[in-house]
Regions:
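Predominantly extracellular/luminal regions of secreted and cell-surface proteins
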Residues: 1-17
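Aromatic, loop-rich ligand-recognition surfaces of beta-strand-rich domains
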Residues: 16-82, 94-142
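Short proline/glycine- and polar residue-rich coil/turn motifs
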Residues: 87-94
Length: 142
């Protein structure tokens, strides 16, 4: 990806992006879902899971349709623990950052986050019908 913010580890580096996607803290995914798995090395208690995303529709960057979180103790069998739907309007002109989060008491070693891409840039958009981008700067595990 052109926007890789230092590679896979960037999504768990505690470095938050600004509403300027050109700042090097954003991971960009073009026309694909974002699927990221974090290994905590051992089973840990978790109270909150979140993914931080950016929308800048003038640059073809849209919020995911939804973000789903999964947990596992073995890294193979994952259980869904929550889905967060997007409620940010695609027509918002200014860049906006939003955290898709769930508050739930969990215990797991592996966390998987799946952010579903939009089907295509909306009909009213200059890029109508073309794939959009998903930009994420952090996966939050508390």
């Amino acid at each position: 990806s052109q926007y890789e913010a230092g590679g896979d580890i960037a999504l768990i580096d505690f470095q938050r992006g600004s509403n300027n996607f050109r700042v090097g803290t954003w991971q960009g995914y073009h026309g694909v879902d974002l699927i990221a798995t974090v290994d905590l090395s051992e089973v840990q208690d978790i109270n909150r899971l979140a993914g931080s995303f950016l929308q800048d529709q003038k640059s073809w960057i849209f919020m995911p349709k939804q973000v789903e979180f999964f947990v596992s103790n073995d890294g193979k069998n994952f259980k869904s623990v929550g889905v967060v739907k997007n409620h940010i309007s695609q027509e918002t002109e200014e860049p906006v950052m939003y955290e898709f989060s769930i508050d739930k008491k969990l215990s797991a070693r592996y966390i998987k986050m799946v952010a579903k891409k939009i089907d295509a840039c909306p009909d009213w958009h200059v890029g109508a019908g073309e794939p959009g981008w998903i930009f994420c700067d952090e996966i939050v595990i508390e």
